[in-house]
Amino acid sequence: KLTVYADHTRNKISKNIFGHFMEHSADVIYGSVYDPESRFADADGFRKDVLEVLKEVQDPMLRYPGGNFVSNYHWEDGIGPKEKRPKVFDYAWLAEDDNRMGTVEFIKLCEKTGAEPYLCVNMGSGTAEEAMHWVEFCNGTGDTKYANMRRELGYEEPFHVKYWGLGNEMYGDWQFGACSAEEYAKKALDFAKAMKWMDPSIELIACGYDLGSDWNYEVARVLKPLISHIAIHHYSIGYDIFKEEDYNQCMYIPDYLTKLTNVAKASIVAGTNDALTDIKVAWDEWNTHAWDFEKDKNDCNYTLKNTILTAGILHSFIRSSDVVEIASYSPFVNVCGAIATDAEGVLKRAQYYVFELFSKVFRQCDGYVETHMEGETYSLPEVIDYSNRKAEAKFALDAKSAQRIVKTNYI
């Protein structure tokens, strides 16, 4: 039985929860989004067929350039004439990168698709000064070195990049420059102060940990005056968290992410010692599946289950829209993304259509209405540690709906 409380409208839904992520890894950017040699390439080297899909889905926000890649990325390598840009070794993915895609190209991509740019700075091998210079290059208005560097490239007006991430997954031993929560918070404080000195209007998103309440507490405690969000990442299937062959487990994933959101918010409240803190949660990397470069190439793996889970996770973010304002599906193109490309064109995978629907419908809503669902329950394995739950759902209705309670049988 499904009950819809049409009077009970809650929480404005941020369009940025329907955002996406791209990284210098495999064919997420090169050979797909950016491919000057493609017959689909425009004058700037971007594939027009991919741009069209990004515009169709009304992509609201793009996070770049990583990801693990960013922890050894130096933004100045990707500036200036392409033939003069250095080819570097990427420690994260054990590959070479020729830096053909850089800051200016990324800004052009956002302009072409209408997406809000979200840049993540290097807190692995990078410095606070380097990050501050990047902000100056993008947003500087004075007669200064890095603002003038942008002007020399033909961009008199600043890029007005509002959102900046303070490193990527710095808690993980797979990360270049990994550190403890205390070390990260201290280092991030220096980065945040330097970047805010350059442009006080920017919003900073600190590195959080989906399974690390102590980490999130410490980050919130130290950085509370300077950050707007704490970012957490989650890939449900593929890292021994959920088993793809267990249908009931998989259908629990959206509720599991809601619980992770609540735990992260509780850590932020505790760390700031402020129940009314404005610091939000950003799910700026998420996918139903982990990155598995061989398995992900098989488009037969993307089925109705992916569609249902993707929709369920987006519903989780909508239900938590008082806390969650940013989310980035990771990645959008290739690997386990919503679309796949090859030399002949673009394939829209099953989960793509969820984003096309949700971004067009929910971004027009002032909020969502309360619903309650009652039905059969089922037990989950001890590894998940929740059982006999009752499902809850949220639906967007026309704001002009009459005030009423609607009851219906759900099959």
Language-model regions: role of each:
Residues K1-W215, A220-H229, L257-T258, N262-I411:
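Non-catalytic accessory regions flanking glycosidase/transglycosidase catalytic cores in CAZymes
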Residues H234-Q249:
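Active-site His/acidic residue clusters
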Residues I237, P254, T258:
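Active-site-proximal helices and loops of the catalytic beta/alpha 8
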